[in-house]
Design a protein with these regions (language model features):
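N-terminal leader/linker segments that initiate helical-solenoid repeat arrays
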Residues: 2-3, 19-83
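Terminal, low-structured helical/coil segments at or just beyond the last alpha-helical repeat
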Residues: 25-35, 62, 69, 73, ...
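Alpha-solenoid helical repeat scaffolds
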Residues: 48, 65-68, 103, 137, ...
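TPR-repeat structural position
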Residues: 57-60, 95, 129, 163
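Alpha-helical adaptor scaffolds
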Residues: 76-149
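Register position in tetratricopeptide repeats
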Residues: 91, 125, 159-160, 189-196
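Residue-level signature of tetratricopeptide-repeat
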Residues: 119-120, 153, 187
Length: 199
């Protein structure tokens, strides 16, 4: 049976039955108010448009890196500081400290996708796949085009043996970023694996 976190994920990405949208908990639905300011949103939207039109992987990778840098800023100095300290804690192998910081951050700014994506990373490093799924779902509820969260979800599904679901997630990422190398390589690998399995 599909686990609840995965079910919510697939609902958010349109990969499960249409009725699932009504079944998702309110906390997993997209927020009505964006976290970032209008100027940052406009810059990100422009980068996403360029990403969709990128002609080669090198261009796409560069644009994704710029989007990642934008995603690191919430519009709140306190939020940005908590995220930075959590990243430093992870780099120092202090995952529990990072989780505590990210707990505080997600409570402070529950609409910031990057905070949930960072907490999902800490969950994964702490050996908690269920929490990883839940926090990635929240990241994607806040920002369905968060490429890092999509890539992490695809990898998690692939690691758990859900190749078909993982492929659909990577294909969704490629709809946003057709030339993005990590998603394209993962999708190609999974298509080959699934084709070999079906022979």
């Amino acid at each position: 049976m599909m686990g609840r976190p995965l079910f919510v994920f697939l609902c958010l990405l349109g990969l499960a039955v249409p009725a699932c949208a009504a079944d998702a908990p309110m906390s997993s639905r997209p927020p009505s108010t964006p976290q970032a300011d209008g100027g940052q949103d406009a810059g990100r939207d422009a980068l996403l448009a360029r990403l969709a039109a990128a002609v080669d992987p090198e261009e796409a990778d560069g644009i994704v890196a710029r989007i990642d840098r934008l995603n690191q800023h919430s519009g709140s100095d306190t939020g940005d500081l908590l995220l930075s300290r959590a990243a430093a804690a992870i780099d120092g192998d202090r995952v529990e400290v990072a989780r505590q910081l990210l707990d505080a951050l997600t409570a402070l700014q529950p609409q910031w996708a990057e905070a949930w994506a960072a907490r999902a990373n800490a969950d994964y490093l702490d050996g908690d796949p269920k929490a990883t799924f839940v926090d990635l779902a929240r990241a994607l509820a806040a920002d369905p085009k968060h490429l890092k969260a999509l890539a992490d979800l695809g990898a998690l599904l692939e690691d758990s043996g859900r190749r078909d679901d993982a492929l659909r997630v990577y294909q969704h990422a490629l709809e946003i970023a057709p030339q993005w190398r990590p998603a394209r390589e993962a999708a190609d690998r999974l298509r080959a694996a699934i084709a070999g399995q079906d022979l």
